[in-house]
């Protein structure tokens, strides 16, 4: 049972999490993976404003887009500060786009973990050395949790491609640039 109404209705992330736990516990043979695969693939959508073939929980999308005065006000202030270039804040729309990318990564990696694939290929990610480096350099590595999540998404998306050698080497080379040799963590700044 969920603590909130929203949590009760959001299913994609929890379904991936449950299936990963079943995999870790080596209990896959006790479940109908064909139905589970179909269920996860049913979330693959083409919704305006998001990359084609993303995995999108429509309930999450509904609650994220629901108008709230405080969220709207914060976004407007963030946009003004961003324009002034004093500091850079993520708006609700950017957070939502990153969430959808993370859910897509999670669904694809879950399907591959159980030996299955998405119905349609997800292709909206950097694919060559220049695009990959440009994308990774655009991330805020002073906030490694978020940047690392985006890096992980790129690793998953790159791993499902047939021609992945350049991608993988570019990802490895970039990680070597941002690793801190004193603590072994991946970030920039202090």
What are these model-derived regions, one by one?
Residues 29-184:
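Extended ligand-binding groove/face enriched in aromatic
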Residues 20-23, 112:
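Alpha-helical repeat scaffolds in large eukaryotic proteins
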Residues 2-8, 92-96, 189-190:
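Short, recurring structural edge motifs at helix starts
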Residues 21, 27-30:
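Compositionally biased, flexible interaction segments
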Residues 11:
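Cysteine-nucleophile amide-bond enzymes
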Residues 15-18, 104:
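Residue-level detector of extended alpha-helical repeat arrays and alpha-solenoid scaffolds
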């Amino acid at each position: 049972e969920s603590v909130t109404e929203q949590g009760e209705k959001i299913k994609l992330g929890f379904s991936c999490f449950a299936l990963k736990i079943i995999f870790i516990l080596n209990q896959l043979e006790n479940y109908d993976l064909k139905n589970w695969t179909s269920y996860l693939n049913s979330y693959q959508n083409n919704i305006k404003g998001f990359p084609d073939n993303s995995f999108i929980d429509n309930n999450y999308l509904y609650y994220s887009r629901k108008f709230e005065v405080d969220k709207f006000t914060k976004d407007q202030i963030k946009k003004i500060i961003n324009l002034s270039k004093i500091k850079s804040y993520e708006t609700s729309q950017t957070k939502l786009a990153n969430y959808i990318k993370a859910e897509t990564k999670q669904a694809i990696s879950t399907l591959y973990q159980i030996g299955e694939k998405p119905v349609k290929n997800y292709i909206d990610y950097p694919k060559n050395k220049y695009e990959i480096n440009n994308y990774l350099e655009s991330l805020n590595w002073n906030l490694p949790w978020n940047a690392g999540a985006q890096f992980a998404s790129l690793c998953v998306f790159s791993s499902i491609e047939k021609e992945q050698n350049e991608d993988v080497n570019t990802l490895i080379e970039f990680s070597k640039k941002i690793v801190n040799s004193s603590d072994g963590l991946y970030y920039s700044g202090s």
